[in-house]
């Protein structure tokens, strides 16, 4: 398959205004070597008219016959892409104009890499720069330097378990090297994090560039915000780390197992959310979050 071409598979359910901005950021790419597929999972806002309005033959539209759910739509996106490189471009995010060239260059420098990622600029609903404490923590945890970042083996997974510093929406996948099964429908939030750990458990390599190439949007109606408010996000992170601990124990990755058992970054995030709930006088959330932060267990 052509390694100088990338497919942007765009799973879509709702948020037509954000989708329009996402597609415009595609049109604005400095490197024109891309294709795009919008996969409409039968949400409330049909996207066909918006997609066709761009009048660009590189952008195609598929409306699923039934709602496939998050994992199902993501796996379909991977399966119908015709190129070796595929980015699951979230429909409420935007690309910096350099993303295509940046990621193609990265993946072609590392021919054996299963996936590649870049740095992110976090934006708000209107596209302005957004500051948040969890994002600042990621900046502290992530590897430093100006060279490409190579993540592999026990050491690589240990760094991700200590703090999930890769912004998974930026990941571009090399289809031919992906683990079998794709994204697991067992998850609603940690699908891509789970896939990165399976890549590393299987001996694969993930590479990254310290250059910013993506704009990740935080807003009140996106999946992350909704699952954070319902605590499903934290329960999944705890369950995921329990799974990583079990798998690490089986193959003798003791340092990963110990870190997964401690769940430090998740517990700190729970305590941070508990403090926010106290400030907001959101009494129904305070105790579950506090107990989760202290004991590393949470029931949604």
Residue ranges and their predicted role:
Residues 32, 40-49, 66:
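A conserved acidic beta->alpha catalytic loop
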Residues 86:
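Short aromatic/hydrophobic "clamp" motif used to bind/position activated sugar donors
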Residues 98-138:
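Conserved donor NDP-sugar-binding/catalytic core segment of glycosyltransferases
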């Amino acid at each position: 398959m052509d390694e100088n071409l990338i497919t942007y598979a765009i799973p879509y359910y709702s948020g037509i205004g954000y989708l329009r901005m996402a597609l415009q950021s595609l049109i604005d790419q400095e490197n024109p070597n891309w294709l795009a597929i919008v996969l409409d999972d039968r949400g409330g806002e049909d996207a066909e008219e918006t997609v066709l309005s761009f009048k660009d033959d590189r952008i195609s539209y598929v409306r699923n016959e039934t709602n496939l759910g998050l994992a199902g739509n993501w796996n379909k996106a991977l399966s119908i892409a015709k190129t070796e490189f595929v980015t699951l471009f979230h429909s409420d995010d935007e690309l910096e104009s350099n993303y295509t060239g940046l990621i193609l260059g990265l993946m072609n420098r590392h021919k054996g890499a299963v996936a590649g990622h870049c740095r992110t600029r976090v934006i708000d609903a209107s596209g302005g720069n957004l500051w948040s404490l969890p994002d600042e923590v990621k900046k502290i945890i992530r590897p430093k330097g100006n060279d490409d970042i190579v993540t592999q083996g026990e050491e690589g997974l240990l760094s991700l378990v200590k703090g999930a510093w890769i912004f998974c929406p930026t990941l571009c996948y090399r289809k031919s090297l992906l683990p079998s099964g794709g994204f697991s429908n067992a998850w609603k939030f940690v699908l891509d994090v789970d896939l990165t750990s399976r890549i590393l458990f299987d001996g694969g390599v993930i590479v990254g560039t310290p250059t910013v190439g993506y704009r990740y949007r935080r807003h009140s109606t996106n999946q992350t915000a909704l699952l954070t408010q319902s605590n499903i996000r934290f329960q999944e992170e705890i369950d995921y780390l329990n799974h990583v601990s079990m798998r690490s124990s089986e193959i003798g990755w003791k340092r990963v197992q110990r870190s997964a058992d401690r769940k430090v970054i998740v517990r700190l995030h729970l305590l941070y959310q508990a403090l926010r709930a106290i400030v907001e006088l959101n009494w129904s959330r305070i105790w579950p979050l506090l107990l989760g932060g202290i004991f590393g267990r949470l029931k949604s």
